[in-house]
Amino acid sequence: MLPVLQDAILQYEKKYSSKIDAIIIFDPTAPLRIKKDITSALDKFKKEKADLVVSVHPCQHNPYFSMLEKNGKYFKLSKQKSINPGSRQEVPVVYEINTLVWIYSRNAIIKEKKRIPKKTVIFKTPYSRSVDIDTKDDIEKINYYLKKNEKFKTAH
């Protein structure tokens, strides 16, 4: 993704003799975003002077507590702290990136060249708007949220 964005920015700047400050990405697989998600994320981007504002929601499966990865013959927790947590309440809160809004600075794309740059700030969104369409089940979830919340339809 970054090489495409780098090329697009540089081509635009060359063609129009105008420098781009930031680029906003709206993933087409995230149809439940509302106008407020965009304006609030943009406000946060400006206020925090971030290189990336990315929308997130609380992670349903915390890697400090309930996710395993292969470790040789056996498995271990994906992320570990010095404590041995006995409950989910004892581990750090973790957020999952969703694709409602990504706002990158020019610096992040052209100079830092990282998907998640050092100056990343999160924009929290509710899980009910964070559904990505990757499977048929996801389409059913979206239909459920749309039927459940009629006012959502008018928030666009």
Describe the role of every protein-language-model region.
Residues P28:
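Helix-loop-strand module that forms the ligand-binding subsite of alpha/beta enzymes
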Residues Q6-K15:
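Short, charged beta->alpha transition segments
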Residues M1-D7, A22, P31-K119, K124:
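Conserved core of the sugar-phosphate nucleotidyltransferase
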Residues L10, D43, Y144-K148:
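Short, well-ordered alpha-helices that flank and scaffold nucleotide-derived cofactor binding pockets
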Residues F123-K124, S128-H156:
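Hydrophobic helical membrane-anchoring modules
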Residues K15-I24:
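Short acidic donor-binding loop at the edge of a beta-strand
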